[in-house]
């Protein structure tokens, strides 16, 4: 949402719940942004953030209601490799904290970072397998080059 700050953007889902005060809405939004690594970008607008940061705002917006399941549809689809692995690392951390994440991707390599892979084709389940050798996105991230501006 181009005209809102990160914190305003994340507050939006809570606006529909009259039981949540403005202070609680703000506090929960700040906590969600901190959880995704954007505690220092609370008042930045989308034109002041990278694609990866905007994706993190979207994830924080999904987390602000404390869901038991998070649906991430092509969450790394339009991101560069390094940013994709930053997002995957975040998802693995959320999963380690007990959150169920349904991660939709067209990239089979990305699926090796999940605990279970369900392959669909033409709307039908073609494969359903547990991954006994889950790769660590954080470890892969350490091997990727850091951009010169960081």
Residue ranges and their predicted role:
Residues 1-113, 117:
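ABC family nucleotide-binding domain
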Residues 89, 119-121, 135-136:
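Glycine-rich, phosphate-binding/catalytic loops in enzymes
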